Amino acid sequence: MRWLSSIRIRCLLLGVLAALLLLPACGRGRHRVLEVAYVSAPQAALRDQVAAIFNRVGNVKNGERVEVLDREKRFARVRTSTGIEGWIEQRFLVDQKTFDALQKLTADNQNDPVQAPGVLRNDTNLHVTPGRDTEHLYQLASGAKVAILKRETAEKQSGAAPTPKSGTKTGAKPSAGPVLEDWWLVRDTLGRVGWVLSRMVDIDVPLDIAQYAEGQRFVAFFALNEVEDNDKGVQKKVPQYLCVLTDPHDGLPFDFDQVRVFTWNTRKHRYETAYREHGLDGVLPVTITKEDFDKEGNLPVFILRVKDDAGTVNERKYKLNTPIVRRVLAPGEVPTRSGKKRRG
């Protein structure tokens, strides 16, 4: 009967071994990855349990990739790249689709020309599309520097109807159409691209030309070239600027409606308006380059994109031969008048 006992022992050992092999598989089943998500909050704590009283087991930061293992009401159990597991509020997470959309937005606009540098007034989210309720992932801190690429408009988030003021007619007609807000497509210092509310960004215009805004809003500006200036024995190079402006209102049907060129007077050591043009139905981006003009030499050139009455976008080329700005017409091109235009 000893052989029978030996068989029983072997069977028992095989059963124990099989159970041990199944345990990790069961563990993997309980902690299988449901999906991948990304942290949209500036920072969030991971807790050991979904309860009023909990222990913090770790922290995650904005943009961090996590694996979602489980979901329970408002919370998701996640695992970080370092293997830490814990519960986090689901509102602090966005899905892979949002991450991929921002990656595509970055790739599609990685070579777009910068229209102006900007500085953020407050902490601001990078949105996938213009709009306060659209998906977002990365958050930029107040004071962060960004490069402005494009402009779009989006309907302002609707709220409660305002209470009529005393003395106003209750039967007055509501304003026509939705209220629109301006949004900038920006690139941050890490190369990430997204949409931000324009009022959250200050265009970082040099003070020397910002003082000539005359109540208008700077949309973009560019240094066309530099000139040598000698002021009381102090030699320096001074940039000459193309500035693109518009009325200080959101929701306009154009990106800009006026341009000005500021050149430096080397005798009076100050900026002067060399050229200005109004009445444009302008569309970003504006392009800056250089071109050879035979006897005039190699001159700075800027190209504006302007809509005509039919809504077709046409390019207009201009050259600066300090202090004169002139339109450069293509063979057979007939200039069109946009509105008031003068030098001064």
What are the residue ranges of the model-derived segments?
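Bacterial N-terminal signal peptides that target proteins for export
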Residues: 2-13
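C-terminal motif of bacterial Sec signal peptides marking the signal peptidase cleavage site
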Residues: 22-25
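Boundary regions of SH3-family modules and the immediately adjacent low-complexity/disordered segments
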Residues: 27-41, 67, 79-118, 160-237, ...
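SH3/SH3-like (including bacterial SH3b) beta-barrel domains
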Residues: 33-34, 48-71, 128-151, 157
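Core beta-strand residues in small-molecule sensory/regulatory alpha/beta domains
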Residues: 46-49, 114, 121, 125-129, ...
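Short, conserved beta-strand segments of beta-strand-rich sandwich/propeller modules, principally
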Residues: 75, 181-183, 301
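Short beta-strand elements that form the blades of beta-propeller/WD-repeat-like
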Residues: 238-252, 297-308
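Non-catalytic C-terminal interaction regions
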Residues: 286, 290-344
